[in-house]
Amino acid sequence: MDPLRAQQLAAELEVEMMADMYNRMTSACHRKCVPPHYKEAELSKGESVCLDRCVSKYLDIHERMGKKLTELSMQDEELMKRVQQSSGPA
């Protein structure tokens, strides 16, 4: 696969993952903060605050998980390099 095509696929996957995260966040926060039967067309103060906190927490956790996964991936790469170096040519 040529580098340009690989870059395009990576960009498409990133967009798909971001859309999925947005949809899951929206659904989870809506379920948590907005009652199934609306009383008014506008969000109440409590609903608005709940949604703000929910989205903030969701994004914070997503960022923390991303950093941790990157860290673990880098550790795995280092371990693989060490294993390859130690089992080098015989």
Swiss-Prot record:
Superkingdom of origin organism: Eukaryota
Cellular component GO terms, alphabetical: mitochondrial inner membrane; mitochondrial intermembrane space; mitochondrial intermembrane space protein transporter complex; mitochondrion; TIM22 mitochondrial import inner membrane insertion complex; TIM23 mitochondrial import inner membrane translocase complex
Keywords: Chaperone, Disulfide bond, Membrane, Metal-binding, Mitochondrion, Mitochondrion inner membrane, Protein transport, Translocation, Transport, Zinc
Lineage of producing organism: Eukaryota, Metazoa, Chordata, Craniata, Vertebrata
Function description: Mitochondrial intermembrane chaperone that participates in the import and insertion of multi-pass transmembrane proteins into the mitochondrial inner membrane. May also be required for the transfer of beta-barrel precursors from the TOM complex to the sorting and assembly machinery (SAM complex) of the outer membrane. Acts as a chaperone-like protein that protects the hydrophobic precursors from aggregation and guide them through the mitochondrial intermembrane space.
Complex formation: Heterohexamer; composed of 3 copies of TIMM9 and 3 copies of TIMM10/TIM10A, named soluble 70 kDa complex. The complex forms a 6-bladed alpha-propeller structure and associates with the TIMM22 component of the TIM22 complex. Interacts with multi-pass transmembrane proteins in transit. Also forms a complex composed of TIMM9, TIMM10/TIM10A and FXC1/TIM10B.
Protein name: Mitochondrial import inner membrane translocase subunit Tim10
Transmembrane segments: none
Record-linked PANTHER family: MITOCHONDRIAL IMPORT INNER MEMBRANE TRANSLOCASE SUBUNIT TIM10 (PTHR11038:SF16)
Subcellular location: Mitochondrion inner membrane
Tissues showing expression: Ubiquitous, with highest expression in heart, kidney, liver and skeletal muscle.
Gene Ontology terms describing biological process: protein insertion into mitochondrial inner membrane; protein targeting to mitochondrion; sensory perception of sound
Topology of this chain in the membrane: Peripheral membrane protein
Family: Belongs to the small Tim family.
Free-text domain note: The twin CX3C motif contains 4 conserved Cys residues that form 2 disulfide bonds in the mitochondrial intermembrane space. However, during the transit of TIMM10 from cytoplasm into mitochondrion, the Cys residues probably coordinate zinc, thereby preventing folding and allowing its transfer across mitochondrial outer membrane.
One annotated GO molecular function: protein-folding chaperone binding
Disulfide bonds, paired cysteine numbers: 29-54, 33-50
